[in-house]
Amino acid sequence: MSIDLKKRKVEEDVRSRGKNSKIFSPFRIIGNVSNGVPFATGTLGSTFYIVTCVGKTFQIYDANTLHLLFVSEKETPSSIVALSAHFHYVYAAYENKVGIYKRGIEEHLLELETDANVEHLCIFGDYLCASTDDNSIFIYKKSDPQDKYPSEFYTKLTVTEIQGGEIVSLQHLATYLNKLTVVTKSNVLLFNVRTGKLVFTSNEFPDQITTAEPAPVLDIIALGTVTGEVIMFNMRKGKRIRTIKIPQSRISSLSFRTDGSSHLSVGTSSGDLIFYDLDRRSRIHVLKNIHRESYGGVTQATFLNGQPIIVTSGGDNSLKEYVFDPSLSQGSGDVVVQPPRYLRSRGGHSQPPSYIAFADSQSHFMLSASKDRSLWSFSLRKDAQSQEMSQRLHKKQDGGRVGGSTIKSKFPEIVALAIENARIGEWENIITAHKDEKFARTWDMRNKRVGRWTFDTTDDGFVKSVAMSQCGNFGFIGSSNGSITIYNMQSGILRKKYKLHKRAVTGISLDGMNRKMVSCGLDGIVGFYDFNKSTLLGKLKLDAPITAMVYHRSSDLFALALDDLSIVVIDAVTQRVVRQLWGHSNRITAFDFSPEGRWIVSASLDSTIRTWDLPTGGCIDGIIVDNVATNVKFSPNGDLLATTHVTGNGICIWTNRAQFKTVSTRTIDESEFARMALPSTSVRGNDSMLSGALESNGGEDLNDIDFNTYTSLEQIDKELLTLSIGPRSKMNTLLHLDVIRKRSKPKEAPKKSEKLPFFLQLSGEKVGDEASVREGIAHETPEEIHRRDQEAQKKLDAEEQMNKFKVTGRLGFESHFTKQLREGSQSKDYSSLLATLINFSPAAVDLEIRSLNSFEPFDEIVWFIDALTQGLKSNKNFELYETFMSLLFKAHGDVIHANNKNQDIASALQNWEDVHKKEDRLDDLVKFCMGVAAFVTTA
């Protein structure tokens, strides 16, 4: 699809936002394709695009591939009720407004001067026509011929009850200049929009009209009725010219084929699509049940202009394309029209999902089961990769098919699901439990099809829970009567049986090594088993029935949801309760561990989604939603959270902010919960998962939070000796730095290889030397080159040393450490120097001490001793200052000893000695205590 516009960043409206969750940010919703609002088709050159409605947003697909091109940038205040497309622009009607969009970005908003809601749209020429539910028609016109879309109000038309009642459709017939055809439930009206006059009114039709479509023939419009009649009406003559009858069907959509074949498609509310050949006056093909009757059947069916392709949609959240192959000619001259062939489709659940699970470790696919009895594999990366899992049964062992009707109903609703990918592609890797069925089914994720085996319960109970071993070899079936059955996934053979529970088994799990199995049931019992020996290790009785279980393999923790509205966390190794989480005020619907096992996210009928921190046992985040969550699942890498809700056919995806920035783990109460809207299909500008996670959450700032944590004092009391809070290894490294360096030196230089392969015998230097000889350039050996480089370096070093001194003899350059040392001597405050010295690495400390000027008048050495004396007086970092003095004597001890009669050095050392002796009292006290203790113990 070629569009001559470039993407541009849209500045988000500055509006007051409510408080957001500090952990989760709404990202997007997957699985929504269309609803009952008829789609719109548009053309750009030779390409077509399709606009579908999904509640308060719309999506634009490329008709050639059904790839998603654009999504509206933001949700409308209320649901969209009508769509229309005209070249680059999409018109969406909601309430009393019409939004004009380009590439999903709102360009203009028209607000009708009425309280009635817009119901139908029609765009032709310079006009935009919008009808409302009070039978008014508002006409807008381009204010200038160069305008891209109509935006100026022109006139208003009114249809009275006498003229036909409720408006059904707005159409424009080809060659009817400035004329608008208004189809009501009983009449067809023709208005001149330029003058605002009613030009023509048809006779009243006996049956109620439900839809209308202009024919490619002049003056003809097709009308569909509630009784199943298709009326070809001539507007110029004002009479019927043909009637097609479809028994017991309400017609919902009409479309004419325009690629040379005179075919008419008729969509019905029962979900059938019927094709008529207008030349032969006969029905040629019927597509049965392409859309579900319970959701309105076919809401829209449209032939692409000049193409043998028809696009259909329905309220069952699906968009389909069918194509007519070239017709076959027979010898008698008859033409055989081949039935339309399924071409491509996009879809999703038609009812809210009942169970979800991530299908792989890369968070690429997600399995979703719904109340519509389907199992879908949704792609989080590319919508075109989503597809429904096939329920076609395998052949019997003798090669025959399973008996019965080929048009069968789907499997019952899935109530539990388990998946493991260790053996994907080798045999089935999915188990599902279905409502009111006494056996579980297997599925193959690679083939996207139901598997070969069905696993029966052994006590004639319904399947209530399923699980799989991490190796993918064993499947576990929990019964409503309390038994646990284990099957081999490859052969489908029964392997083990357990009977511990007296009521339904609600959860089964096995550790990663296939050693310990855990089960729970409505009887409140948690059972622990040795899987290899098939023995019971023990059981734990809880105070309330257990409704669900989630196991975290890496930590050997499992969480249980109880009927008393609590979540209990149990250690599988010790078989004890380690945490009990209280807070929900209604039944817990779903919960899940974070991948690292630190958090539990739970949802409840109290409309909250809570995040629990297991180390502290507190609730650290809460979200209040208007739509109760029924499932929550963390992605394997922890960057996403998937939720499903009571209403809505899609899967909501939330971004985990903790993956991208630090979040507070402070325990909060319900008054601090954030009320948030669910994710939607709309995208603001170029938003991505990362931008949503990093945006300001409008809540607490980490810098302004009192975390109630204790911070150790730097010094409890000035009279007490305080050691440094740094690692003990730092002092040891300082004391033995010379030994460490000696050990780190290589014992011998690396040796050259004596014999090299023929293709490595000439190094780059050797090749260059030989080239120099051939060119007549003087030869230099590597030793000569090295000697020349050393001499050049010596000259540079000498020049650098000379540049350090000015003519006055004062230093022209000094390091930051030396500068702090000099400034401290002037102010008699070395605190800044001491802070810098303590934060230095051992190597940096050694370098600075060795770099002290050891020539007369020994100012830097004296200043450094004074600084250490001041540090020792503060009683802070006691052992570090002692170590620094030891390093000073190691580096400059000979200079200090040789100049011990220097007045400045002697005075500085005397001050150090006085302070040091004063602090030596600690050593005397310790020795005294040791002596007394030794006397008492030996006396």
Curated annotation (Swiss-Prot):
Pfam families: Beta-prop_WDR36-Utp21_1st, Beta-prop_WDR36-Utp21_2nd, Utp21. CDD domains: WD40. The modification Phosphoserine is found at S772. WD repeats lie at residues 40-71, 81-111, 119-158, 168-201, 208-245, 252-287, 295-347, 354-388, 415-454, 463-497, 505-541, 546-581, 583-624, 626-664. It comes from the Eukaryota. Transmembrane segments: none annotated. Its main location: nucleus. It is found in: Nucleus, Nucleolus. The modification N-acetylserine is found at S2. The keyword Zinc does not apply. Keywords: Acetylation, Nucleus, Phosphoprotein, Repeat, Ribonucleoprotein, Ribosome biogenesis, rRNA processing, WD repeat. The keyword Acetylation applies. GO terms for biological process: maturation of SSU-rRNA; rRNA processing. InterPro entries: Quinoprotein_ADH-like_sf, SSU_processome_Utp21, WD40/YVTN_repeat-like_dom_sf, WD40_repeat_CS, WD40_repeat_dom_sf, WD40_rpt. GO terms for cellular component: 90S preribosome; nucleolus; nucleoplasm; nucleus; Pwp2p-containing subcomplex of 90S preribosome; small-subunit processome. The WD repeats are grouped into two tandem seven-bladed beta-propeller regions. Involved in nucleolar processing of pre-18S ribosomal RNA and ribosome assembly. Present with 2020 molecules/cell in log phase SD medium. Interacts with snoRNA U3. Interacts with MPP10. Interacts (via WD repeats) with UTP18. Component of the ribosomal small subunit (SSU) processome composed of at least 40 protein subunits and snoRNA U3. This is U3 small nucleolar RNA-associated protein 21. The lineage of its organism: Eukaryota, Fungi, Dikarya, Ascomycota, Saccharomycotina.
